[in-house]
Amino acid sequence: MTFISDLRTVFWRRLDLQGLEKLDLSVTDDGVRATSTILSTEGAGFRLDYDWRLDARWRTKSLELKHLGEGIARHLLIERTAVGWLIDGLRRPDLDHVHDVDISATPFCNTLAIRQLGANPGDELTFGVIYVDAQSLSSVASRQRYIRKSGDVVRYVDLATALGFEADLCVDRDG
């Protein structure tokens, strides 16, 4: 039997584009599960649903994404296995060096890195990610850096996919 130690619902509204996200998060002794729906009303708009399963250290075990936009349904399954990352069941050796996953349309992925970042100002974490474009569900290797500026501010720096993009993220005690 798994004990549920924390269960919450979080809403995010995008500031850069028109859209919102509803995320249900459950934390148990065995790990974390995040299920979410993202709605984007930019352009033709789209809906993205995901089911993200994490281990007790907040590292991705699996991530299933379902995208609906312009009358087209897309699906993507990412799995961490003992032999490496699988994308829709196929091993991707080009992703062997990555630490975790980043979806372009959700701030939740920042939480995974921030929870592993040190608590002291100046603490820094740089690692590879599988970057998933929310519109196309394409997946590529990328690199990111997180720098703790203060207890509640973390600087995000993209080092590959959106090279040069930086943002200060205001965070609570949960990341």
Annotated model-derived regions:
Residues 2-22, 75-162:
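Solvent-exposed helix/loop surface patches that form functional interfaces
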Residues 4-49:
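N-terminal ordered "arm"
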Residues 22-25, 49-53, 144, 167-169:
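Hydrophobic/aromatic beta-strand elements that line small-molecule binding cavities or substrate pockets
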Residues 27, 54, 80, 149, ...:
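Generic beta-strand structural signal
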Residues 27-29, 54-59, 120:
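A short, structured loop/turn motif at beta-sheet edges
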Residues 37-41, 66-68, 157-159:
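A generic structural motif
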Residues 42-90:
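Hydrophobic/aromatic-rich structural module bridging two neighboring secondary-structure elements via a short loop
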Residues 51-53, 155-175:
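Gly/Pro-enriched, hydrophobic low-complexity segments
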